[in-house]
Amino acid sequence: AMGISGQPKALVDLAELAKDTEKGRKLTGRSQVDTRTRAFACYGIGMVAYRSADIDVKTQAFDALKSVMEEANNERNIKVAAINGLSLMNLQSDNASEKEKKLTVDVLACLDKFFDSKAGRGTDLIKSHVPPSIAKLIGRGDSKLHQKYKNDYLKALFPKKKSGNDLYRAAAIALGQLAQAQSELKTDKKYSDGLKKYFENGKDAQARYFALLALGQIGGNENKTYLMKVLSKGNKALERPWAAISLGVMDFLRFEKDKKSAGIDVTLGKLLVKQLKDVKNPEARAAFAVALGLCRYTDAAADIMNMLMKYKSQDELAGYLCIGLSLMNYQPAKTDIHNVVKESVRRPELLKQAAIALGKLGDKTVTTTLTGMLQEKESNLAKLSAIASALGFIGDRRTIQPLKKMLFDDNLTPLSRAFAAVALGGVADKEKLPWNSKIARNMNYRGSVETLTQSG
C-alpha cells in the first residue's frame, strides 16, 4: 500500500524494510524482517519510483534496491522482487537529463552485474528476470545500447553450453520487447529469424511458445505470414493457440498504432474462426476466442455466443469466451454474459471473468448484482475475492456509497467487509489497470516465486 500510494516519503521506511535494518525490524516489531515483507517492500520501492518524475526520488529508490541486489544472501523472493522493482524505474529514453542518463547506466550495470555473476545454475530462475526487466527499462530501439542487448539475448537463445530453461524463456521475452520489424529496421531481421529458429528447433517448449509470442510483438508482414502458417499447420493443442494469441497481439498493436484508419483483417479473422470450430481442445478454443477479440472480428461473435451457451458449464472456456466478446466490443452479448454472472455464484473464476467482460462492454448494471453478492453471508474467500476484483476493475463510481456502507455494517461478516474495502481501493485507483499490471506485463511468469505469483 505504501508503494501504491506513490508517496516519496514512504521510501525511507520501505528501504529499511527491504534491507532488514534495525529500524526496519522495529517497524515490524520482530527480530528480523521476514522474507515476504522484504520482497513486497522492494516492489513498493519500484512503484514509488515509477510514479515519481523526480530524478532524486528515483535515485533514492535505486540506491535501496541496489543494496538488496548486492547482498550475499540469494533468497530468491527478495532478489526477484528487487530485480522487478528496478524494472519500474520508468526512465525517459528521449530528452533525458544528464542525471537521468547516469541513473539509467547505473541501473543497467547493477542488473548486468547480477546476470553475469557466476553463481551456479541454482540462480537461473532469479537471473531470468533480468532480460525482461532490462527490456522494460529501455524499450524498443536501435541505439548501440539496444543492439548490445539484442545481440546478447540472441546469443542466449543459442549458447555454446546448455543453459537453464528459464534463461531461454527470458531471452525470447526480451527480444520481443527490444527488436523491430524487418520493415522498420532491416538489420533487426536476424532477431526474428533467431526466434523462428528457436521455435522450430528449441528444446524447451515454453521458450518456443514465448518465441512465437515475441514475433507477434515485433510485428511485420514477414512475421505475420510465418505465424499464420503455424496457426494453420502447427500442433493443435499448443502451437496453434500460441500463434493465435501472437497474431491477436500483433493486430491489437496495429489498432493501437493507427486508431483512425486501421481496418479489420478479414483473412486472419476467417482463419481464426476455422480453428475455433475445428479444434476441440477447450484451452485452445479459449485462446482462439481471445485472439478473435483482439482482432475485433465481430463476424465471429455469433459462433462465440453459441459456444458460450453450449459450454457455460466449463468455467475456464466460458470465461475466456466472455472476454473474447468484450474485446471485440460486441454489445449484444451483455444480457447473456450478465446471466452468466448471476448463475456463477459458486464459480469464482467464471464470475470474475464474466463480470470483467461486462465492465469492458460498459455495462454498469452488473455492479448492482456484484454488490448484492458481496452482502450475502458468505465465507467463500475465492468468491469474495473475485467479486472485489471485478468491482475494482469496472471502477463504477456509483458503487462507492454502497461499498462504504458495507464497510461499516456490523451485520455483515468480517470477510464481506474486508473485501468491500478491497473493492473500494480498486474503484478509487486513478489508473485504468490494477497496480500490479506494471510488474506482470512482459515478465517471465514461469520463473515464479511465492511473493510474485501468490497474493495470499
Question: Which residues are covered by each model-predicted region?
Answer:
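Long, helix-rich interaction regions
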Residues: A1-G456
